[in-house]
């Protein structure tokens, strides 16, 4: 059957074909972008599907119900996975008795912070082993290990919310289970309870984004209180007072000394006056421990530690 079209119909069809061809041509301009987006999506999902070598959600490993806080490093060596062949730590040996105060000192980049990261199992050692109460920490359940350890770093992280909200985050499991008594006890140990109770809203006071409503010393003492919420047996201090002015440092240092009581404490210190009372001081140099002893012993050796003390004394003048 032969069909006939009017000129109007012909023009409509012709116009549709022309404009359709133009739009189809425009689509091809986006082909490179579509290809790039597809490749990026593939890479992103491959990354999301990766399982960490150290999985905090894993149920594997021995659960350490009770912890004395005896820490031992046995011939520990470490190099970062991204820098193979460049050892950061070599042959590290430390025996830190329960309840003792130990300090790590040395120049920047000598391996002090890496030592603390290994203790928390952010990484696993490349050689040797780290023991907690005689257990290789790699054999312990990770959540169980971190339950007994708390870290106070140089730059405390506070979240937009109340003081109470930020303190409850220190609980390893359910923050809602933290009692008011526990909150007050942690704040008292961190030497900040009087300050909190003097505020109109008390523990419900808003701290602002990143704690902008608080001073540096107040933020640091809140971080100490948060670390104590879980009542850890091991306290790690990574230059916890180095970013503070001298007045705030004295207040925070008093809080740290109180928090360290009855706990195994490993402190990284830039200002050596804050760790002169330590039971043992380990002086790091280029990834190895070059000296170990108390303040007086190391001064008499007239080595790296004595040199650091002299330099800081000169800086004050």
What is the predicted function of each stretch?
Residues 1-4, 22, 26-36, 53, ...:
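An intracellular "coupling" helix at the cytosolic face of ABC transporter transmembrane type-1 domains
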Residues 3-15:
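Membrane-water interface of transmembrane alpha-helices in multipass transporters/channels
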Residues 46, 53, 168:
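Conserved E/DxxT/N motif and adjacent residues on the DHp alpha2 helix
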Residues 23, 30, 47-50, 278, ...:
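Amphipathic, soluble alpha-helical interaction motifs
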Residues 13, 17-47:
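Cytosolic ends of transmembrane helices, especially the final helix of ABC transmembrane type-1 domains
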Residues 53-66:
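Pre-NBD coupling/linker segments of ABC/ABC-like ATPases
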């Amino acid at each position: 059957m032969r069909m006939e079209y009017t000129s109007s119909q012909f023009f409509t069809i012709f116009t549709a074909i022309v404009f359709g061809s133009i739009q189809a041509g425009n689509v091809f301009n986006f082909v490179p972008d579509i290809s790039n987006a597809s490749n990026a999506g593939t890479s992103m999902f491959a990354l999301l599907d990766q399982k960490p070598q150290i999985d905090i959600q894993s149920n594997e490993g021995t659960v350490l119900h009770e912890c004395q806080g005896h820490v031992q490093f046995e011939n520990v060596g470490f190099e970062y996975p991204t820098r193979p062949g460049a050892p950061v730590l070599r042959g590290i040996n430390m025996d830190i008795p329960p309840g003792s105060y130990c300090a790590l000192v040395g120049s920047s980049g000598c391996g002090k912070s890496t030592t603390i990261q290994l203790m928390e199992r952010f990484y696993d050692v490349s050689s040797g082993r780290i023991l907690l109460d005689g257990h290789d920490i790699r054999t312990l359940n990770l959540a169980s290990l971190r339950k007994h350890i708390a870290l106070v770093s140089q730059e405390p992280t506070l979240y937009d919310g109340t003081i109470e909200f930020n303190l409850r985050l220190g609980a390893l499991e359910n923050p809602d289970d933290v009692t008011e008594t526990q909150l007050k006890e942690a704040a008292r140990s961190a030497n900040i309870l009087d300050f909190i109770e003097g505020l109109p809203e008390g523990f419900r006071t808003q701290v602002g984004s990143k704690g902008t409503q608080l001073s540096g010393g107040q933020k640091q003492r809140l971080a100490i209180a948060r670390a104590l919420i879980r009542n850890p047996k091991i306290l790690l201090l990574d230059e916890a007072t180095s970013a503070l002015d001298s007045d705030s440092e004295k207040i925070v240092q008093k809080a740290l000394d109180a928090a360290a009581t009855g706990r195994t404490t490993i402190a990284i210190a830039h200002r050596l006056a804050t760790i002169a009372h330590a039971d043992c001081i380990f002086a790091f140099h280029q990834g190895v421990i070059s000296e170990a002893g108390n303040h007086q012993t190391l001064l008499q050796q007239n080595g790296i530690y004595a040199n650091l003390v002299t330099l800081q004394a000169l800086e004050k003048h």
